[in-house]
Amino acid sequence: MAVTIDPKTFYANPPPGKPFYVRFEVPNDVAEKALEILSIARQTGKIKKGTNETTKAVERGLAKLVLIAEDVDPPEVVAHLPLLCEEKKVPYVYVPSKEKLGKAAGINVSAAAAVVIEPGQAAGELEALVSKINEVRAKHGLNAIPVPAKR
């Protein structure tokens, strides 16, 4: 059953100095670990790059972890992703730079978003990362999102 979330309250209180679509502050070590997992999944599993492919993977129930860059301009390009991830119960994390996200995804240009579909050799690390993300979410008054089960 899909959860309905009011976008006005969903985007009401971003952390200071962050774009409106950022729901919680992600520590640098967590963001770096997410980029590392994306890189490992690219080599040993399956990922998708870009906002459109990320959106499709979440909607189709394929996503295990969504990475969203914090420096996207215009921010409306990725603003729907946190809300979609909440509705579909997919873990998501913010990374500081779209350049770093593109590099971790294995492309020579920046990427606004990317998604891990199959973690490959990073499966154990992915579960540990989602636990850390849920700890950060709890500090901001958000509910935990479990790692999606295998299909």
UniProtKB/Swiss-Prot annotation:
SUPFAM superfamilies: L30e-like. Multifunctional RNA-binding protein that recognizes the K-turn motif in ribosomal RNA, the RNA component of RNase P, box H/ACA, box C/D and box C'/D' sRNAs. The keyword Cytoplasm applies. This is Large ribosomal subunit protein eL8. It is found in: Cytoplasm. One of its GO terms (molecular function) is ribonuclease P activity. Part of the 50S ribosomal subunit. Probably part of the RNase P complex. Keywords: Cytoplasm, Ribonucleoprotein, Ribosomal protein, RNA-binding, rRNA-binding, tRNA processing. It comes from Pyrobaculum aerophilum (strain ATCC 51768 / DSM 7523 / JCM 9630 / CIP 104966 / NBRC 100827 / IM2). The keyword Cytoplasm applies. Its main location: cytoplasm. GO terms for biological process: ribosome biogenesis; translation; tRNA 5'-leader removal. Belongs to the eukaryotic ribosomal protein eL8 family.
